[in-house]
Amino acid sequence: MLKQWFNVGKIVNTHGVKGEVRVISRTDFPEERYKPGNALYLFLEGKDEPVQVTVSAHRLHKQFHLLQFKEVETLTEAEKLKNALIKVPEDQLSQLAEDEYYFHEIIGCDVFSEDGDLIGKVKEILTPGANDVWVVARPGKKDALIPYIDAVVKEINVADKTIKIHIMEGLLDE
């Protein structure tokens, strides 16, 4: 079976002269994911196989995460990593609490009303602030924006890829 990879960030530039790289993070758990000693996998442009690296340092700088890898000690080496996607295999995903889900578990789920009517399919998840917002593609209609809050999301079945929601007034207005 093919190994499934999950995107946790992208190297967008270098930082300084000692091989640090500037990362736009795509993980909900940067402190855990980028902890020194952790293995990450870099998918470089034009390369078929990922390159394994080990985090030696992590810090925040403005809106970026700065990472140092044990295998990268110079600016010249770090330059070669620009635009690389940082991924981890499925077996490195953290265990979540019972009512928490990874984006890949939610995207693709069919969304139903409490009455059992199909509303559409989750195609994207937005993270604007206080709570996530699920973008639900509806056949022949405008996408619906569903807030991930207890008052709306009533049931999630990851195994069946189904979600049941309470339709509050105005939620699905055209």
From Swiss-Prot:
Transmembrane segments: none
Functional description taken from the UniProt entry: An accessory protein needed during the final step in the assembly of 30S ribosomal subunit, possibly for assembly of the head region. Essential for efficient processing of 16S rRNA. May be needed both before and after RbfA during the maturation of 16S rRNA. It has affinity for free ribosomal 30S subunits but not for 70S ribosomes.
CC annotations in GO: cytoplasm; ribosome
The keyword Lyase is annotated on this UniProt entry: no
Subunit structure: Binds ribosomal protein uS19.
Main location: cytoplasm
Record's keyword terms, sorted: Chaperone, Cytoplasm, Ribosome biogenesis, rRNA processing
Membership in a protein family: Belongs to the RimM family.
Stored Gene3D superfamilies: PRC-barrel domain, RimM
Protein name as it appears in the record: Ribosome maturation factor RimM
The encoding gene: rimM
GO function terms (MF aspect): ribosome binding
Subcellular location: Cytoplasm
Cross-referenced InterPro entries: PRC-brl_dom, PRC_barrel-like_sf, RimM, RimM_N, RimM_N_sf, Transl_B-barrel_sf
PRC barrel domain sequence ranges: 98-171
Any GO BP annotation: ribosomal small subunit biogenesis
Lineage: superkingdom: Bacteria
Domain remark text: The PRC barrel domain binds ribosomal protein uS19.
Originating species: Bacillus licheniformis (strain ATCC 14580 / DSM 13 / JCM 2505 / CCUG 7422 / NBRC 12200 / NCIMB 9375 / NCTC 10341 / NRRL NRS-1264 / Gibson 46)
